[in-house]
Amino acid sequence: MSNMVKYITKQSPTLTLKESQEWCGGYVQMIKLKNGRKILVDEDAKIKTPRPPINEDASEIVNKSGTYVWMIDILGKAIVLEKGVRKGGW
């Protein structure tokens, strides 16, 4: 398992917006995947200097889901929310 992706399940402790932002490294953007999962990524990763590394695992999750997104590669850390999970009430 990659240290660049955090997985949140129904059994995971509550995840707040602040915790999500701290993990991802800034403001987060939620991408809803076709398979029902959601992924949180750093909204401003592409304009940061230095640029965060490509997150191969998160990019693969998005690409395999069949979801079209405006970004080719996910940069930096990401959080994957299992289908039906919305943590922290935000």
What is each of the regions a protein language model found here?
Residues 1-90:
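Detector for the mature cores of small, proteolytically processed
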